[in-house]
Amino acid sequence: MELGKAKLLRTGLNALHQAIHPVHGIAWTDGKQVILTSLHLHNGEPKFGDSSVVGQFEHVHGLYWGPGPPDAPALLAVQHKKHITVWQLCFNAADRNKLLVSQICDISEPFPVLPQGCVWHPKKEILAVLTTRDASVLHSVHLNNCRIKADIKGSGLIHCACWTKEGNRLVVGVGSALHSYIWDDTQKTLNACTFCPIFDVGGYICAVEATLNFQIAVATELPLDKICGLNAGVAFEVPASIETESFPSQSSLCGEEEYSMDGGKKVLDAEKPMSAVTSPVDLTHILSSKPGADSSPLLHLRPKDYLTGSGQDSSHLILVTFEKKVTSTKKVSIPGILVPDIMAFDIKTQTVSVASNTCNVILVYSLTSSNLPNIQQIQLEKNEKPKGLCFLTNKLLLILVGKQKFTDPAFLPSSRSDKYMIRLMIKELIFEVAPSTSASVNGSCASVNGSLNLSNIPHDVSTDVHPLSRGLLIPDRAALQSPTSRRKLIEEIKSPGYEQSCLLNMSDLKEKKVSLNFPPAVESLNAEPLNQSASLSTTSLAFSNKPTSPKRQIETASKIPNSYKNNLLSEKEASYFSKNVEKLSGNFTQLQHHVCELTELLKAGKRNLPMYPSSQEPSFINITCQKQLSRNDSDERRSVILCEGKLRLSVVQQIFNLSLVEMQHGSSWIVLTADSEGFVPLTFTSMQEVVVRDASMKGYSARSSKTLDIISSTEGCRHSASESLDITSSLEVLRDCSSKALDGSSPSEQPSSKV
């Protein structure tokens, strides 16, 4: 459904959060007006009705329906820049078609209200209001001065908040920590949680959403500050023995948390003194501990990787369960979305949809499995962004899509809002009882020439095609992960069209050669469920010498177990993986042979076999090479064969030992050149006479010019019709003509001499 033009916030907005009322329909805004659009479900299918404008303001950033029974007057919170107004809507008792709207509350704030700064209590008319600095609870919207502020510890900025499902706990996202408060409805108090007041999730919080009774879902953004420059000054790792014996540790130098390679976080002991290092540390006295090293004072350092395997290389979806004894978490990475600031939850299917105001990808995760698999992707157009998400039913996801005009990425936007063409889109979610595990749990990754982790192959049931789903496979490097990249690697082999292609080594592609003896492309295939690996021998995984049928169906992705007890593979599962991997290897071999055959056929087809003439009737020309203008030098004559009427210049140069060749054409000389194939760019006829000479000799230029002058002056005396005369014949003609001229002019010259 097209809604038209709207001016909405660029980031942090979920325009469909608490935006649907069972009676009044969808509340949405174009930035100034408050508009209601009727929505009904007819046999499970949503039907949109008429729209009506119920209010107009200078700025409208968000609309939120309050809780309550359908037959009671509805409460609508309208979020503006620095204040919030609460309106009551009800139908006229006499005329059901007439809607009565009245304001019951106006809440002003010293700071701008957050994009999702209005959070209604799930069961009661209690409203939580959020700014960047304050979080307060309005326990009665009919009274303006009944707010209770939350005691926010620390100096971080507030970004979002949510009530848990039972309504007893308010969780506020401040920086990278969750601040938990217990709401006492009887005494109207808001107190910090006693057993877990502050819980750090390890990443900057973008959005929170209540899921089950004591559980919330948290989305954290990609830590660009840590990637770009957190530990830029410390680029190397020092051996542990040297580090402990010779100089202060990395953590004591930096005074911050350190993330090790295995993903564990080393928290500094608060009781240990933090030694501030203000001068350079002398390391020249430390000798290398490498066996067989020389005595030179050199350190063997290696680049230190703070991100790979530490969970800091992507945004994350985290489930936090608040319990009295322990606060537990589950974590999965969100590939392709840098700032996941939109979330929606469906309690029936226990699925969470995650999106971003700045990315055209929507991911759907299932919370029923312990691995939090990504079950579907929704791909929007390149210039479209999701501006709101909510579940209509357990299978229908309502999306507010904003289409943005092209903006120059070189210039950062200067305002919090932007103009969009907005529309409502309904997407059906497909649920299958299918095995799946998360492709990005614990940062595991697959390699083409290394090992392929089959335990982390996700199962995607979406019909949407997303660029991330294809994956980028590079030899000797990790594959860029996506929720469906590994399953696609197996799925596409099933289709007959994919049998025409296979993965080739990059060096073969560069040289455009395919070897007949294919080495195994996969050296070892490991099943690694959460850092617990069950290795399969490389001998059983080697490619079979006998090619298998290309019609063979591979059933690897659909038979992967759905859950792993204690994250370990049983022997039966390991043998099952081994059999399927052998099938996969055999099909790879067959595909490689097919590619080899196709390559050879293409090479053979490109060869244009010329039709050569018979040896009894060869096609050749006679070439005469003129030497120096002296009686001792004689011209050299050779017959050279033609190639389809073309003459190869290098052959002429080699025969007559010439570096630069020029050919006689009438009374002129033409310097010969060669084309890209080495032929003279001229065609010759069989038995043609050609005269050439060395064009690099300077003696030719003077003598040839005099010779041409002599030939042209005696042209009337010559009786020969030949176009090319050598020097000897021209001199003979000159003598004859000169003697005749002297004989004819002698009588006339004598009288004149006498005079």
Swiss-Prot record:
GO molecular function, a single term: kinase binding
SUPFAM superfamilies, A to Z: YVTN repeat-like/Quinoprotein amine dehydrogenase
Ranges in a coiled coil: 576-604
Keywords: Coiled coil, Repeat, WD repeat
WD repeat start and end residues: 55-97, 153-193
Name of the molecule in the record: WD repeat and coiled-coil-containing protein
Organism this protein belongs to: Gallus gallus (Chicken)
